[in-house]
Amino acid sequence: MSEFIKKRIRELVDLINYHDYKYYVEDNPEISDYEYDMLYRELVELEKQYPEYIFPDSPTQRVGGKVKEGFKEVVHRVPLLSLSNVFSEGELYDFDRRLRELLGTDDFNYVVEYKIDGLSVALEYENGLFVRGATRGDGNVGEDVTENLKTIRSIPLKLKDDINIVVRGEVFMPKDEFIKLNQEREENEEPLFANPRNAAAGSLRQLDPRITAQRKLDIFVFNVQWCEKELKTHDEALRYLKYLGFKVSPDYVVCSNIKEAYEAIKKVEEKRGLLPFEIDGAVVKLNQLALRDVAGSTAKSPRWAVAYKFPPEKKETKLIDIEVNVGRTGILTPTAVLEPVRISGSVVSRATLHNMDYIRQKDIRIGDTVVVQKAAEIIPEVVEVVFSKRTGNERIFEMPKKCPVCGADVIKFEDEVAYRCTGVECPAKSYRLILHFVSRDAMDIAGMGEMIVKNLFERGLIKTPADIYDLKFDDLVNLERFGVKSTNNLLKAIEASKKRPLDRLIFALGIRHIGQKAAKTLAEHISSIDDLFTITEEELLKLPDFGEKMAKSVVTFFRQDQTKHLIERLKKAGVNTVAEKKAKSDILKGYTFVLTGALSKYSRSQAKEILESLGARVSESVSKKTTAVIVGEDPGSKLTKAQELNVKILYEQDFERLISAKSHEEVEKILME
């Protein structure tokens, strides 16, 4: 039986790795997502039951569960040198002349490749298994990012040959993933990445591999650094790398001489804007590997290769108008409407103006002649005004005082750049608000994930959080992948959410600057949500840890007619809007706990809520003042910190005894054991 199980696990590993290669490397999937998911699920279940049969190249081993304290240093077996740059045809011909003089022969050719704008890494394989991956660093010493690199699905964990080899590649973020990531960061009010290269570097150097896995990075392998197998040309090496299972630099061209190489470079430049990934030039490499040894290297760069860098393409055009778009968090963003102009291979008719401060600093006006370029070759932006072409008929732009989508007030805090719509029912931001409303820390509607919300939203069945409570059986049962059982479960979850405490509802409303802690503070100082419609900024500033921004945000939010309408609908649906009289008990008052890892019976937010309802304080960090750390499965660095500080460690069974304690003496006894 055990041999049969082991054989089946091996079959699944090989099969899934094959389909990963077809999907992520060749972009030619042979099975549906559903079929793939079923294979993967079978493998996960078998590995759970038989962990002794987990193979190192199993696709389940790509994402580790532990957060690192830092990255170890790795000394590269072969230095990862940087390339010297040229910027013109003349400089390219000078490179060719120097190389011919150095080699004393014309009997060689070149390979021209894309210069991918990403992060350079070395991948090391022993007997065909991926054992180590490191960043370039200073060329001699890099950082060990093996676990993070395993999350990149186009990196094979096992090669077709059992060979020892070190290869070099460029990790990058595809353009569409970069745009998606920045949209998500904007919605979460996190700093945006300036370009795909920064996004790739920041993603690869995450201490938590799970974050890296979410970022959808990719890689092109472009060089054999060291290999047991004898290879004669770079062209042969690339073909061998592809055979082994690597995703190699695409569309490379073998050129007979430098003239052909320059022609290939110009073709690359013509299509750079149409590529799904970012490039900042082309690389010209000597093809014959033996001659590379003759040419040698300087301390920083090889003499046998050069990077031809492309300048950012800029064009003049007319700014016809400025439109205002409203994002999912309510931020108003000005967009330039342009006379169409071709830049980097595509026609541009709209460009970002970033924000109102940017418009003022650049003195951009409607009717101006402006210079447009593609930021990081992706997002068109207005970079400057051609003041010499001003006629006097240009118009100064002002941000609207009312939301162009829903008509609610637009506000701007003094120390912020952004202008925001305050409307709680604004269609432009309601999708994101609904996702927040149903989330675990808010109304905790189990089973109402992003796909369900998106489906309901696109069908027009929900437009505001209140619409959730109007959903009927017939609305849900016909949704994709929904049946009678899942429909009934979701309706039960929606019904259960009506009984959530008031602080959960306040947090669920998505009020700017009001997190869980502030929502709890508000709920503790009012009798019902109705009190917030008349509360003043002065009264709010008297509350613990309430600042001016928070106070202004609450008052502005609850003065909107849309808010009043939403609360009335929630009340009518039976959602609790009244504060609890008092905490269940103060038996844990004076104690501070930290949670780490996953408890089997309680979510993190549920455990926190229970502890706080008993008077305890729950902290995010461990210190000498921490009473105890409650540890679940797969704990993080907090456990290590607790052990270093000699802080009491409690497990799930201790937690359950603690919250069931009837007296302070019983609590002390548990903590002293």
From Swiss-Prot:
Protein's GO biological process: DNA repair; DNA replication
E.C. designation(s): 6.5.1.2
SMART domains: BRCT, HhH1, LIGANc
Catalytic activity from the UniProt record: NAD(+) + (deoxyribonucleotide)n-3'-hydroxyl + 5'-phospho-(deoxyribonucleotide)m = (deoxyribonucleotide)n+m + AMP + beta-nicotinamide D-nucleotide
InterPro entries: BRCT_dom, BRCT_dom_sf, DisA/LigA_HHH, DNA_ligase, DNA_ligase_AS, DNA_ligase_CS, DNAligase_adenylation, DNAligase_N
Binding site for NAD(+): D33, Y34, E35, Y36, D37, S82, L83, E113, R136, E170, K285, K309
HAMAP family, per database record: DNA_ligase_A (MF_01588)
Annotated protein name in UniProt: DNA ligase
